[in-house]
Design a protein with these regions (language model features):
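Fold-independent oxyanion-binding glycine-rich loops
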Residues: 74-76, 97-100, 136, 141-143, ...
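Mature, Sec-exported extracytoplasmic domains of Gram-positive
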Residues: 59-66, 75-77, 104, 175, ...
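Active-site-adjacent helix-turn-beta-strand microarchitecture at beta-sheet edges
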Residues: 105-194
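Beta-strand-turn-beta hairpins that frame and shape the catalytic cleft
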Residues: 64-67, 143-146, 206-212
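Conserved, well-ordered active-site substructure
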Residues: 106-130, 189-205, 211-244, 249-274
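Zymogen propeptides
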Residues: 2-143
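Short hydrophobic-aromatic micro-motifs
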Residues: 71-74, 94-96, 147-148, 174-175, ...
């Protein structure tokens, strides 16, 4: 009996089979992508699991000038300064970036209870001074539970009631109470790239002594960032604050938001710990 050769698939059926196989492959790729995203989100949630009990609130604001701000509001007593040498979004720690740095050297004041936060590095870049310039430094006096901005070159110049109960974060004066001369002050303090559109960070406080840690999602000049803060943060009751390191160093992590800047590591952060 003569065996017939199996009929070849028609061109139409062949395209149909190829289409089905391609569809299955695309579906598998999408499922794998979603699994990776879900795993990443779960890992971030696990990292911040202990942070869910922290005393802070998160909010975001779209300012009239187009800047989008992410804000962590907390009490200064619930905050510390910490060296991390990592991107904040990878640290598992709630907070934002801190002062200026170069390599692993901290170029801004960063002290807690009179101890420089980067003291392990040696004699330079420890956080004991605002290198080269007297700059606006946000100071929390634990004895009086009050915040202030003091222009200083060295941490030893700062005025507090008890030098064993305070923290101080260096930056650039924002001069919220002096709209006429704030730009002049930033020039004195050599604020970097004030006219460029860059990511920005800041720490400000209100009349009730609440602390606002702010990172922009959109780029803007120093002036537009300051304007956005005045317009959207603190319900018109802000007292003063400082600009922090910016651009790729502008980073934030909370259970609600994750802003990695340009993914670079930063030396130091302002961390919410209570």
């Amino acid at each position: 009996m003569e065996m017939k050769e199996p009929a070849r698939l028609s061109r139409k059926k062949m395209f149909a089979v190829i289409g089905i196989l391609a569809g299955i492959l695309i579906a598998l790729v999408i499922m794998l992508y979603l699994m990776i995203i879900a795993l990443g989100n779960r890992n971030e949630a696990n990292l911040l699991e202990a942070g869910q009990a922290l005393h802070y609130t998160y909010d975001s604001h779209n300012a009239p000038n187009g800047m989008t701000l992410h804000v962590l509001k907390t009490r200064p007593a619930d905050v510390t300064l910490e060296t991390i040498n990592n991107n904040i979004t990878l640290s598992g720690k709630v907070g934002i970036n801190g002062g200026f740095f170069y390599g692993e050297q901290l170029l801004s004041i960063g002290v807690v209870d009179s101890i420089p936060v980067n003291k392990e590095i040696g004699s330079f870049g420890t956080g004991s001074e605002n290198v080269k310039y007297a700059r606006g430094t946000l100071v929390w006096d634990g004895a009086s539970d009050l915040l202030s901005v003091q222009v200083a070159s060295k941490a030893s110049e700062l005025k507090v009631k008890d030098h064993t109960r305070f923290w101080a974060q260096g930056g650039i004066s924002m001069s919220l109470g002096d709209d006429a001369r704030w730009v002049e002050q930033t020039v004195k303090e050599n604020a970097p790239f004030p006219g460029d559109d860059r990511l920005r960070s800041a720490a400000v406080y209100d009349e009730a002594g609440m602390l606002y840690l702010i990172v922009s999602e959109t780029k803007g000049t120093l002036a537009s960032f300051r304007e956005a803060i005045i317009q959207t943060v603190g319900e018109g009751k802000l007292v003063d604050g400082i600009f922090l390191d910016g651009d790729g160093s502008s980073q934030l992590l909370s259970s609600d938001a994750s802003l990695p800047g340009d993914n670079r590591p930063v030396v130091q952060m302002i961390r919410i710990v209570k």
